[in-house]
């Protein structure tokens, strides 16, 4: 991503913008403008894909924050966004790892003292609902009476609901099976579920390993942006450490810029951690994910 073009991995700014501001889930301007911090260490979560993984593996992110006297501690890997939100609210981590906004909103609605600090948009939008080639499921309407693995209150469930609504399928006619990604993949492979709603790289690996195909692809079949990648911390941490939050936001922005300018190298880094095939990696390189 060039400095002149944020249309791909577009940082929508700090929490003064985006859906957090619309929902009243951000700090006031005065809080963001306050100087200082009460800690020199930030505990960040990471998973086996995405911006935080690349930041952790490359090391440039930590060096940039070290210039401000900030030490980074990495916690993980986590399978998806929701457990990182639990780590933040439980006090064992300071930031969620940059995941789906849907579980974040669900947590806030349930009373978690979280605030958004930053939003990211990825292109292409590759979240998909897939089924094995031998399943007889070829379109959304074929899901009636079938079971679909989704992560509860996460992007997988959100996409499935959107697909059913678009195709006018009553959600009560489809069985939602709540599984985290590490459990959903073998469930699809063994036939314990009929389909899986999932994001990259899990969905891409499953297509090849389990001979699966798309029923519904977000970027192709959905006309609107269904979700944002979001970062959250507790309101207390943000209020006490606004300078640190700004520094972390800036460091992630710099990492995103590097990824957009070095997408092929980034894919090799992601593959090493994700342990998927060269074929999947080469597909990602061809996509020029940003």
Positions of PLM-derived features:
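N-terminal secretory signal peptides and thylakoid transit peptides that target proteins
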Residues: 2-19
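Stable alpha-helical elements in mature extracytoplasmic
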Residues: 57, 80, 84, 103, ...
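Cleavable N-terminal signal peptides
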Residues: 20-21, 31
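Loop-centered beta-sheet repeat module
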Residues: 184-193
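Periplasmic-binding protein-like
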Residues: 120-131, 212-238, 245, 287-289
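Short, glycine-/small- and polar/acidic-enriched structural segments
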Residues: 34-170, 175-178, 194-200, 215-216, ...
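Secondary-structure end/capping motifs
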Residues: 239-290
């Amino acid at each position: 991503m060039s400095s002149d073009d944020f249309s791909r991995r577009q940082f929508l700014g700090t929490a003064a913008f985006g859906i957090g501001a619309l929902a009243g889930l951000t700090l006031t301007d005065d809080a963001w403008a306050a100087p200082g911090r009460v800690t020199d260490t930030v505990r960040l979560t990471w998973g086996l894909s995405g911006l935080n993984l690349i930041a952790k593996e490359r090391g440039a992110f930590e060096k940039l924050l070290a210039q401000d006297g900030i030490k980074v501690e990495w916690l993980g890997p986590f399978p998806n966004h929701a457990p990182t939100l639990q780590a933040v609210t439980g006090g064992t981590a300071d930031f969620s790892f940059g995941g789906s906004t849907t579980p974040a909103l669900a947590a806030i609605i349930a009373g978690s003292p979280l605030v958004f600090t930053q939003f990211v948009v990825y292109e292409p939008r590759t979240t998909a609902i897939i089924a094995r080639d031998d399943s007889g499921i070829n379109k959304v309407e074929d899901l009636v009476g079938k079971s679909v693995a989704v992560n509860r209150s996460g992007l997988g469930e959100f996409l499935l609901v959107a697909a059913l609504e678009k195709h006018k399928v009553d959600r009560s006619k489809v069985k939602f099976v709540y599984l985290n990604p590490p459990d959903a993949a073998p469930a699809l492979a063994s036939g314990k579920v009929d389909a899986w709603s999932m994001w990259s790289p899990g969905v891409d690996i499953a297509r090849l390993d389990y001979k699966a195909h798309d029923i519904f692809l977000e970027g192709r079949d959905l006309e609107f942006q269904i979700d944002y990648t979001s970062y959250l911390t507790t309101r207390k941490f943000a209020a006490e450490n606004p300078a640190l939050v700004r520094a972390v936001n800036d460091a992630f922005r710099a990492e995103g810029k590097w990824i957009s300018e070095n997408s092929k190298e980034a894919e090799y880094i992601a593959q090493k951690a994700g342990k998927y095939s060269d074929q999947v990696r080469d597909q990602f390189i061809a996509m020029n994910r940003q």
